[in-house]
Regions:
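Flavin-dependent oxidoreductase catalytic cores
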Residues: 1-190
């Protein structure tokens, strides 16, 4: 028997203005990578996003999906909050790793509230951003400790879309050694 899974994601600053002409949001304001600047998320919009993740998981469950995966890696919104490269906030969503992880933890809690404790949740994370000043393996080990007991599966890769040289680690190709991200998963699993 195969299991059906759905990936839940918000692009944050990676939203493409060619396909989306609404506001582009990130943890902090800044210049957009595709020519459209982005704004810092306010509390009301953060709450809205958290609720929509929960609603999407609930719809997936009602539709017969067996597990949801929250994408908190590769430079998407939840990862942007985690990354010191993107998150320059000074409120409860910035500064310490625990604060930068807060939105992801709120998403998980919202999904648990709407789908129950028996509905499996996977979190996909970058074990390291592979870029100076970015998330390190040590940071992500601490993030995994926050996830422990709250999710059912942690999926570890590496890299971040905003830094193209790391893309081959997100989707390993034939030029990298087989299992190139396994050392990250092993360290996080400990």
């Amino acid at each position: 028997n195969a299991f059906a899974a759905v990936e839940l994601i918000h692009p944050g600053t990676r939203a493409n203005p060619e396909y989306y002409d609404g506001p582009i949001w990130g943890p902090s304001a800044g210049p957009g990578h595709l020519g459209k600047d982005y704004s810092e998320l306010d509390q009301e919009t953060i709450d809205y996003i958290v609720e929509r993740f929960g609603d999407a998981a609930e719809m997936a469950k009602l539709g017969g999906v067996d597990i949801v995966m929250i994408h908190a890696g590769h430079g998407w919104l939840l990862h942007q909050f985690l990354s010191p490269l993107n998150n320059r906030r000074t409120d409860k969503y910035g500064g310490s790793l625990e604060n930068r992880a807060r939105i992801t933890m709120e998403v998980i809690a919202n999904i648990r509230e709407k789908c129950g404790d028996d509905f499996p949740i996977e979190v996909r994370m970058s074990g390291t951003e592979i870029v100076e000043g970015g998330l390190t393996l040590e940071d992500q080990i601490e993030f995994a400790k926050l996830l422990d007991g709250k999710v059912d599966l942690i999926h570890v890769t590496s890299g971040t879309f905003p830094v193209p040289s790391t893309n081959q680690h997100m989707i390993p190709n034939g030029f990298l050694p087989q299992g190139c991200n396994v050392y990250l998963a092993e360290a996080i699993k400990k």
